[in-house]
Amino acid sequence: MKKLTYLVAIAFTALPFAVRAQSADAIIDRAAAAYARLNSMRAEFRQTLTNTLTGTMQTTSGVILRRKPNLLSINFESGDRVAADGSTLWFYLPSSAPGQVIRMPYSGENASTVDPANQFLNSPRTRFTVSSAGTAALGGRATHAITLVPKHPNSAFTSAKVWIDDADSSIRQFDLETANGLKRHVVITSFTANPDLNKSSFRFSVPKGVKVVDQASGVTF
C-alpha cells in the first residue's frame, strides 16, 4: 500500500510538468483555430515603438479591421494608414514619409506580415519554436503568454511574446523585437469578433498632391 501511494504521489507530481510542457502548443493551437474561424474582426489598440539604437520612443493608438479573405485596414490616430483592398496593399505614412504612398500587390509575404495576428497564427508550430511565458490579467481578462522564436530567419521579428485570452483565445497583447533593435509593444484595448464590415471601409483613396510609389515596378507617379 505504501509503495502504491508513493507511486501515485510520483505520478501526480510529474503530471503538472507534463501539462506545462504541452500547454504552450495547446494555447497556440487554440488561438490559431479561433483566428481561422473569424470571418471579420475589429480591434482597437495602443502601440509603443522603442528604438534601442537611438533611445527614442513613440506611442500611438489606432483601429484594425479585417474581413476574409483579403481585406485589411489599420488606421492610426497619427493619420498613418495601411490598407488592403483585395488586390493592392497601400502604405500611407505621412508621420514619417510625407507626400507619398507606397503600393504593392497584396499577396505572398506582403499579405502574411502586414496583419499582426496572421504573422503569429499562420501555421505557428511549423514556423516557430513555442514556449510558455507565464500568465497575466490584462484588462480584467485572464491570459496565458507564449514566446515565439522563428525557426528560420524572419524579417518581421527575432522573437515575440504573445498573450492569449483564456476565454476566447484572441490575442490581447504582444511584444516583439526586430534584428535592428526596434521593440514593438501592442495592447488590444477592445476586440469584436465577426462585426458587419462594409467593403468601403477597406478602400484607399490617394490624397490630393501625394505621389504614388509602385514598389513592383519602381515607378513613381
Give names to the regions the model predicted.
Residues 17-57, 67-71, 206-221:
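N-terminal leader/targeting segments and the immediate start of mature chains
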Residues 61-114, 184:
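An acidic-aromatic
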Residues 98-142:
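Flexible, surface-exposed loop/linker segments and immediately adjacent secondary-structure boundaries
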Residues 45, 71-75, 89-92, 148, ...:
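Short hydrophobic/aromatic-rich beta-strand segments that constitute the beta-sheet cores
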Residues 1-8, 17:
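Bacterial N-terminal signal peptides that target proteins for export
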Residues 38-40, 59-61, 69, 77, ...:
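Extracytoplasmic
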Residues 128-219:
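Gly/Pro-enriched, hydrophobic low-complexity segments
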